[in-house]
Amino acid sequence: MYAVIKTGGKQYKVAKGDSVFVEKLEVKPGDEVTFDEVILVNDGKSTKIGTPVVEGAKVVAKVEKQGKEKKVVTFKYKPKKHSHTKYGHRQPYTKVTIESIEA
C-alpha cells in the first residue's frame, strides 16, 4: 500500500515504514503529524485518485528529527570589475517516518 501526499508545496510517494525528508514543520521530534492532503491511495487492488484530495484519507507519521541540508554555495562575479559576492544557504527540513496510511 502506498500513497501520494502533498506538504510544503511538494508531493511525496510514501509507504508504511518509509523515512521522508519534507519541508520544515513546526513540531518537536517524537511528535506525531497527520497529513490530510492525500492525492492518491493504492492498496494493491485498487487505486483511489482524489479530486483534488481523497476524502477521508490520511497519513500518520512520526517526526524523527529537525535539521538542515548541506550548504549550497552561490558565487557571483563581474569580470574585470573586482566585484564578487559569495552566498551560502542551508535549507531546513523535517525527517518523518510513515506509521500508517488510512483510506
UniProtKB/Swiss-Prot annotation:
One of its GO terms (cellular component) is cytoplasm. One of its GO terms (biological process) is translation. Pfam families: Ribosomal_L21p. InterPro entries: bL21-like, bL21-like_sf, Ribosomal_bL21, Ribosomal_bL21_CS. Keywords: Ribonucleoprotein, Ribosomal protein, RNA-binding, rRNA-binding. GO terms for molecular function: rRNA binding; structural constituent of ribosome. It comes from the Bacteria. This protein binds to 23S rRNA in the presence of protein L20. Part of the 50S ribosomal subunit. Contacts protein L20. Belongs to the bacterial ribosomal protein bL21 family. This is Large ribosomal subunit protein bL21.
